[in-house]
Amino acid sequence: FKFLYGLDQSIQEMIFRWSKQNLIKDLEHVRDGENEYIDVRGKISNHELTEPINLIGLIDSKKGTIRANHYHPQQEQKCLFTEGQVIEIFQDILNLNAPKITQVVSKGQLSIIKPNVAHTMVFTKDTTFLNLVRGEREHDNYGITHTIKHVFVDEKEKNMLLSNYKFECR
């Protein structure tokens, strides 16, 4: 066995390539599909994924329910919404003074959640989305490796969001 490149050369090449990428630094952001193709049959909407994905979860959630209240220490999570609508609440857990931030994600949009960002979803409609991740997601490891519980939106706050959230001014 022979290495084709030295470690120094490989690291320099990685740094060069990564420094040329236009990275989004937001904790969590939402993107619409791009490069749409529309004809009489319907619409094709494209979402570019910037890293490999090895697991896709299909998640159905009922109107008025809450999911998440956790963070991922290492994984970036992508959620592609195929039906419904959700209020996402998120917070940077590495910054003790970080505020809670809300945003609305609707059908056809992709939500990208960075590592170490606590997030909760409050469903305003019956919703279906694809959960796209890289890494392991064994149910037995919940709370140990990939997903750490972090309750920061309770039932009272969920109900307040559902009854008072102003979608028109966003």
Regions found by a protein language model. Give the residues of each.
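Histidine-centered metal-chelating micro-motifs
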Residues: 66-68, 108-120, 137-138
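His/acidic/aromatic-lined binding-pocket segments of jelly-roll/cupin-type domains
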Residues: 70, 76-81, 103, 111, ...
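Double-stranded beta-helix
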Residues: 97, 103, 118-170
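A short, N-terminal "cap"/entry segment at the start of jelly-roll beta-barrel domains
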Residues: 1-54, 68, 164-169
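Short hydrophobic/aromatic-rich beta-strand segments that constitute the beta-sheet cores
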Residues: 46, 88-90, 131
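Conserved short histidine dyad/triad with adjacent acidic residue
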Residues: 57-74
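Short acidic-glycine-tyrosine-enriched beta hairpin
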Residues: 93-115
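Glycine- and acidic-residue-biased ligand/ion/polar-headgroup-sensing regions
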Residues: 74-93
